[in-house]
Structures are given as structure tokens and as C-alpha cells.
Amino acid sequence: MRGTGYILHAYLLDKNFNIIYCHYNIGKFPWGAILNGNYYYINDINEIVKVNLTTFESKSIASNGKAFMADNDENFIYYSNEFSELYKLSPDDESSIKIADNALFFSVQNKYIYASGGDNGNKIIYDKNGKIIADYSACVNMGADSAFQINDKIYTIFNGGVAYMDLDGKNYGEMMQ
């Protein structure tokens, strides 16, 4: 049977580019992380999937509504759901706790989470337990989902330049092309 669609594949590779794991059920925002010998990713039906890299057994783990986007640090997985709620998931016991609202798009950078979206569209900096550090909504071109940290600044590339600010949302600026 001929179809008009195509199937996307994601490959987990080792340092020598050998395929360790392959999956075809990729979510809208491709993300993957290896924590404690397990590979985690969001599948095409918005579930967080855990794959044991020794046995290659996989299972969906709790996601309190559909997982929309995810990021991680060295200890936890953070994910937002369709209701713009931000959760912190422990890979050890697979438990999740809600830490914030209005965080559809986000990025985990060092000790802070840079979030935006939700009903009010505000941009908020949270600590990793959900405490609000600052509102950076006035930083027009600072995107939460594409933020990256270099030394003591957060940067985002936008159409026309680079936006930057201090880790706490202060001293916002833009460099234009």
C-alpha cells in the first residue's frame, strides 16, 4: 500500500556512533535523556517512555496528563503537560510532583527553569522546586524553550539577533545582526 506520510526514526548512539536503541514513535518536541542507565523520551502519543538500556524493556511512566515538552538535569526529568502544568519526575521511583503552573514551554539551565506559556503568557524563572525567582515577560525576544546558558548569562537566538539576560532575569539586552 502506498501512503503519503512517512515515519520518523530516532536513534540513540554511543560515542562511536553505533546504534544502541532505535524508536519510531517520536513526539512533537524530540527530547531524550539518559539517567541511571535508562533512556527516556516522549513518544508520539505524548507519554514519557522509560527504556532500560541493559534489557531494552520499555514502558510508559506516569505523566499527569499528556506530556508536552520535557527537559532534564542530572537528577530529575521536568515536563509540562497540555494544561501548562510543570512537573518534576524522579527517575528512581517514577513519582511526579507538580511544581508550577503556566509553563508550557521551558528550559532547565543550571539551577533555574525558564518558562513561558500557559493562560497568561507570562515568562517566569523558577527554581527547581517551583519557587518564582523573577518574571521576565518584559524580555520580549527571550524564548524559554530555546534558552541556553554560557557562564553567568542566558541567551536565546531570535530572528534578527541574540537576546541575553542575567540568570535572574535582570540586565536584558539584544544584539542585532
How would you label these PLM feature ranges?
Residues N25, S63, I77, V108, ...:
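Peripheral, non-catalytic segments that deliver or gate enzyme domains
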Residues G5-Y24, E47-A62, F83-K98, G121-A138, ...:
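Surface-exposed loop/turn elements that mediate protein-protein interactions on large endomembrane-trafficking
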Residues N18, N38-Y39, E47, F76-I77, ...:
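Generic structural signal for coil-to-beta-strand starts
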Residues A10, G32-A33, A70, A115, ...:
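Small side chains
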